[in-house]
Every structure is written in C-alpha cells, then in structure tokens.
C-alpha cells in the first residue's frame, strides 16, 4: 500500500524546461505546485503561500539557491519549511555545503521522478 501525502511544493528553477519537467513529475504524483523562476520571487511566494516543501536549483541569476536557503532559514515565517536542493553539482562537498546552508535533502541532476519524490518524502514529517 502506498500512501501519498498531498501537499504544496514551491519549485524554484530558472530553466523553463527543468521547471516544466519537475512540475509535471510532482503534479502527476498529486502535489500542488507553485512555481518561481528566481530566489526573490521564491521568498515572496514562500511567505504568502506557505508551501509544505521548497525544491530549489542552485545556480540562478541574482541570488543562488544556497543564499535562498539561508534567507528562508533565517526568516521565522519560513524557517521550518523543508528545503530540497536540486543541482547539477554532484560532488560530495556540494551536498555537504547545501546541508550547512540549511538544506534538508540534495538531489543531483539529471534525476528520475522516483529520486525527486523520495527526496521530498524524506523531508516531510
């Protein structure tokens, strides 16, 4: 028996194709999806729409996913929201650095639908 916890996920990704793919995987799995194409937009949406999980890219124009992570964890309104970093940076040091910034899980690109869902389920209490 598989139990799917339906929740709302904020995806932060500046690549339209990646954003579309991730949204498709999550919507297909029953999640509600909020999209943001940059960190500034993500900070606003994280506060106004209270997502259950935030999935973010690392390399984005303006503010990186790591900086976004730190900002979210410093803000009392968003500090408890689990963050999944989704990045093409695949070295162990990148994963460790993400965790130091406050990330709760790390997925490397390219990822499968199952890898993404497992990471999200691992951070939802």
Regions found by a protein language model. Name each.
Residues 49-55:
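Active-site beta3 strand of CheY-like receiver
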Residues 20-28:
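Charged docking surfaces used in two-component/phosphorelay signaling
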Residues 30-37, 45:
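Short hydrophobic/Thr-rich beta-strand motif most characteristic of the beta2 strand and flanking loop
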């Amino acid at each position: 028996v598989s139990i799917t916890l339906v929740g709302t996920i904020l995806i932060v990704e500046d690549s339209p194709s990646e954003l579309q793919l991730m949204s498709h995987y999550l919507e297909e799995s029953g999640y509600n999806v909020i999209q943001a194409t940059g960190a500034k937009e993500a900070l606003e949406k994280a506060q106004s729409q209270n997502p259950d999980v935030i999935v973010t890219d690392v390399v984005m124009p303006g503010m990186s996913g790591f900086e976004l992570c730190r900002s979210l964890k410093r803000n009392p309104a968003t500090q408890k929201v689990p963050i999944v970093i989704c990045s093409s940076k695949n070295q162990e040091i990148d994963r460790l650095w993400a965790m130091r910034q406050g990330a709760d899980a790390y997925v490397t690109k390219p990822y499968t639908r199952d890898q993404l869902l497992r990471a999200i389920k691992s951070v939802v209490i």
